[in-house]
Amino acid sequence: MPKFVFVTGGVVSSIGKGIVAASLGRLLKSRGYNVSILKLDPYLNVDPGTMSPFQHGEVFVTEDGAETDLDLGHYERFTDTALSRLNSVTTGSIYQSVINKERRGDYDGGTVQVIPHITQEIRERIHRVGANSNADVVITEIGGTVGDIESLPFLEAIREFKGDVGKKDIAYIHVTLLPFIGTSGELKTKPTQHSVKELRSIGIQPDLLICRSDRPINDNLKNKISGFCGVNNEAVIPALDADSIYSVPLALKAEGLCKEVLEFLDLTDHECNLEKWQELVHKLRNPGPSVKVAVVGKYVQLNDAYLSVVEALRHACIENDASLDLHWICAEKIEEEGSNDLLTGMDAIVVPGGFGSRGVDGKIAAIQWAREQRVPFLGLCLGMQCAVIEWARNLAGLKEATSFELDQSTPHPVIHLLPEQQDVVDLGGTMRLGVYPCRLQAETMGQKLYGEQVVYERHRHRYEFNNAYRNLFIESGYTISGTSPDGRLVELIELKGHPFFTACQYHPEFLSRPGKPHPLFKGLIAAAQSRLPRSPQEALKQTQINSPNQSKNNP
């Protein structure tokens, strides 16, 4: 049976529980332990698939097609472990399962209640991860903040969980905040004390405290927290604000987090191997020349909507010894002001995924600009569909061409609905989701970047390239460099004669890892680097042509 670690959070939301869980996973894996991490989300949605990116941020897609919280992306990237739909649990999915069981008569006419039925379902979900993941340690992050009404069933479930396993098979970690009060010139422990008191009132005594702070925590404060909160002094772990999320595992290792957890779980503290991770952080802190990358999107007001895209760009920059100079460009602003003013000076352009018509014309204009100005371009999902529409309108003479999603009366639906989607009514969980194979055409840029003939990529879409336009597309100078194995679905396209112009129907950002960047992102950054000035004179010239009004954030 695996060991179980539960991570809760107090005082404020967005305190970093996900990064703590992912970092602990990385530290345990560096000692030879298999780890699986799951997230318990307290919202009533069955999954985040139908939620607005402005409310929830990115929807991360697992190999088996689950639409999950963005924290699962952190878990996968830090542990380099593929997770499944078992690793994402919401209040909505719990209630849905319990109600379905009640309708089937599984409860033999009993009164169905939060306790024991809801909490039992939650516990079963956690045990299921342990039984199906081959993990030595299962880490569970509980979403929300201690004290929230929504989180109470989950907290009660993990309290009950202690009765399911042995005393040495479970550990509770509480992430809290030590705010600095400028007028008094000191860090305050009272919010942490009250948060732990709230957790204790539920019946959970934390074994370790991760104390977030923007400045060092001295021994006197640690002793005070230890005394008031009932934890060992060594179990009060400072977690100072970090320059990068990838430096957090190293910082927590230095503070003894993994050693304390292993001691609580009665596991051997094997030799830790973090050499590659340390090299990664060193390269991140000591980058080469910067590359300006514009992300042209429709949800740029909330950067978390494109979290995996940003991390994939960062991984590629680390690998290529480059510094990422990221510019958020609102697609609708391009519609108002034009591409030239907003994109001049960019070394690469990424057009990520999305849904609906808002901002699409701005994305298409950005793609046209990248094509004509020979600026490296990478399109993802909707970004590929926009690249096809741009081709049809500007190179094939099909002025009214668009996607069937955007205009069902268009005479030229160069992007149309997948056949299997024709009769789909529900929105949630019904797209083409999860991993599918892609066969690459030999001697194409895509095949050279991957170095493989067949690759497996994660998808999330309802619409596809319309094969009625395939021959015209190829005759116009484009190459279809990747398709489904049967050749029916267009997965990857590229433009001949362009330094780097490629787009894919899938989401390569979900497979990028620190130290193992995705080939398409790595290729994009390499192409961007080829544009960098090679001499002081060229650098001056590049500075002069950059727009003086260029902003890093154009919401």
From Swiss-Prot:
GO terms for cellular component: cytosol. GO terms for molecular function: ATP binding; CTP synthase activity; glutaminase activity; identical protein binding; metal ion binding. Keywords: ATP-binding, Glutamine amidotransferase, Ligase, Magnesium, Metal-binding, Nucleotide-binding, Pyrimidine biosynthesis. Residues 292-534 form the Glutamine amidotransferase type-1 domain. Residues 540-555 have a biased composition (Polar residues). Allosterically activated by GTP, when glutamine is the substrate; GTP has no effect on the reaction when ammonia is the substrate. The allosteric effector GTP functions by stabilizing the protein conformation that binds the tetrahedral intermediate(s) formed during glutamine hydrolysis. Inhibited by the product CTP, via allosteric rather than competitive inhibition. Pathway: Pyrimidine metabolism; CTP biosynthesis via de novo pathway; CTP from UDP: step 2/2. Gene3D superfamilies: 3.40.50.880, P-loop containing nucleotide triphosphate hydrolases. It comes from the Bacteria. CDD domains: CTPS_N (cd03113), GATase1_CTP_Synthase (cd01746). Residues 532-555 are annotated as: Disordered. It holds the Pfam family CTP_synth_N. It catalyses: UTP + L-glutamine + ATP + H2O = CTP + L-glutamate + ADP + phosphate + 2 H(+); L-glutamine + H2O = L-glutamate + NH4(+); UTP + NH4(+) + ATP = CTP + ADP + phosphate + 2 H(+). L-glutamine binds at G354, L382, G383, M384, Q385, E405, R462. Its EC number is 6.3.4.2. UTP binds at S13, K188, T189, K190, P191, T192, Q193, K224. Residues 1-267 are annotated as: Amidoligase domain. CTPSs have evolved a hybrid strategy for distinguishing between UTP and CTP. The overlapping regions of the product feedback inhibitory and substrate sites recognize a common feature in both compounds, the triphosphate moiety. To differentiate isosteric substrate and product pyrimidine rings, an additional pocket far from the expected kinase/ligase catalytic site, specifically recognizes the cytosine and ribose portions of the product inhibitor. PANTHER family: CTP SYNTHASE (PTHR11550), CTP SYNTHASE-RELATED (PTHR11550:SF0). Homotetramer. Catalyzes the ATP-dependent amination of UTP to CTP with either L-glutamine or ammonia as the source of nitrogen. Regulates intracellular CTP levels through interactions with the four ribonucleotide triphosphates. This is CTP synthase. It comes from Prochlorococcus marinus (strain MIT 9211).
